[in-house]
Amino acid sequence: MLNRITAASVYLVQRFLPSPFVFAILLTLIVLIAAMLSTGQGLPAMAQHWGNGFWNLLAFTMQMSLILVTGHALARAPAINRLLDRMARIPQSPGQAIILVTLVALAGSWINWGFGLVIGAVFARALARQVRGVDYPLLVASAYSGFLIWHGGFSGSIPLSLASGGADLEKMTGGALTEAIGVGQTLFASYNLIIIAVLVVGLPLLNWAMQPKTPKVVDPALLEEPQPSDIPRETATQRLDDSRILGLIMVALAVLFFYRHFSENGLALSLNIVISIFLFAGLLMHGTPERYMRAIEESIRGIAGIVVQFPFYAGIMGMMVGANAVGVSLGRQVTDTFVTWSTTESFPVLAFLSAGLVNVFVPSGGGQWAVQGPIMLPAGAALGVAPEVTAMAIAWGDAWTNIIQPFWALPLLGIAGLGARDIMGYCLLCLVFSGVVIAGGLYFLT
């Protein structure tokens, strides 16, 4: 039964899902029309909101590009390749490979979402090289499914913003919060840990059960990571390019920075810190600046989709939050609609569902928090719902629909060498399963 459902889902996605870039363009037009109709703003005003937002994610675009490039370059280092290949020999069957890659991606995403995306993709490539008969699209989809738990983990932007406190917190929560809420009440709350535990057990089993009868096997030779060859050094400048000493000096400087950072801030893993770790670990593993740059040049081919498409999603976000003369925006109207249907018991679930819907159009935890936080937290407080519960419901909604949002799949797909159509059929079933788990946890455990 599940195989038939999976096959139908994969067929429908491959038949009707447009390419990620076309998807972003169509989404832009849908939001444009919806915002004009719901807020009464004309085309010139919406074009202004779109244009004002279009370049708002430039820094984030660079971060995403760097995490893909540095992570992939690190994975191409000889020592890392050998480690991944040894781990990839552990599974003795395609099903075991599916389970293992899901668990690795889940663990990585719980630690840091960027790390989870990269390590899941590179490990999927390693498994496809080693395990005969494994379905490569399902393997990559399984790696992506691990991303589902990121907002319940250490890099979750919403719980971390609650823990930071300050004037920004009061503004972002519509005045519902004036003091910080520690991660003990969010990330380490019992309901959050139970939701994560159920997903950690359930997702690997679901992915294992979705194995097709006729797997799409990729030629392992196509996934081999080319290793840079040594080039004879005849001049002083050429020998300098291939100097291990220069690389080690920069790595030592980075280690000193990391020591001070973690001593002062604890295990605080920001996106910039993760990128820095990938970059200097890659430089160390490749040995010389010249070899590392050749690995970077090979890895940089996968960022085209990120560079072109992220500005379109920034423009969509601009239209979602662009308000008319009386302060009404499409994002606010979507959120208000869910609020009016809520009771004290159902509010966390409806907050989760509304966040999942808004996330399709505003695929950024920070952007979504800016749209929904000032509306949802005061509404929840009026119904007697704890603010940390409302915040985590929004966080889980943001993480939930990422599984069907090509925006977040682009880094992983760039490393894996697949298109969104190849994995989204499997991701749809992960969406349904995880939605039931998360909604159930929020309803019965909060």
Regions found by a protein language model. Give the residues of each.
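Hydrophobic alpha-helical transmembrane segments of multi-pass integral membrane proteins
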Residues: I90-F123, F310-N324, T335-P378, L383
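Core transmembrane alpha-helical segments of multi-pass membrane transporters/permeases
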Residues: F16, P20-L29, W50-P78, G266-V328
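Long, contiguous bundles of hydrophobic transmembrane helices that form the permeation core
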Residues: L2-Y11, D168-A295
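N-terminal alpha-helical transmembrane segments of multi-pass membrane transport
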Residues: M1-G120, A124-I149, G153, A209-P226, ...
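Hydrophobic core segments of alpha-helical transmembrane domains in multi-pass membrane transport
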Residues: F23-L37, M64-H72, A105-L106, Y144-F154, ...
